[in-house]
Amino acid sequence: MAPKAEKKPVAEKAEKTTAAKKTKAEKRPPASKEGGDKKGKKKSKKSVETYKIYIFKVLKQVHPDIGISSKAMSIMNSFINDIFEKLAGESAKLARYNKKPTITSREIQTSVRLVLPGELAKHAVSEGTKAVTKFTSA
């Protein structure tokens, strides 16, 4: 009879371990009736801003007969984001060095000269100056 007495605690121990090893689904409380009805509600998409339409407009101005693949468009978008981050970072450094709280067109112009090489910087500065004068006159 002694062996039977020893088996009972083992059986109780097995029940405890199975209760402790419940799956995540079993541990979760049942879903409420209010939260379960999601058919009527649509999930709003997070808007992602890209330069794709502007890249396409410039492409059509320069080469109206040429298209661009989605992968090339994605690469161009990444390129513009990268250049923007570099220019913004350099402009912020310049403003900090000069102890100015704002980034002006002067900081942007200087950062363009520092970030972009040679002839490309000259063209970018002239186009930027032209855009700023057009903006202020309008």
From Swiss-Prot:
PROSITE patterns attached to this UniProt entry: HISTONE_H2B
Location in chain, cross-link Glycyl lysine isopeptide (Lys-Gly) (interchain with G-Cter in ubiquitin): 134
Coiled-coil intervals: none
Keyword Phosphoprotein tagged: no
Subcellular location: Nucleus; Chromosome
In-chain residues carrying the UniProt-annotated modification N6-acetyllysine: 7, 27
Matches recorded under Pfam families: Histone
Gene Ontology MF term list: DNA binding; protein heterodimerization activity; structural constituent of chromatin
Region entry Disordered, spans: 1-46
Chief place where the protein resides: nucleus
The keyword Repeat appears for this protein: no
Name of the protein: Histone H2B.3
Species this chain originates from: Triticum aestivum
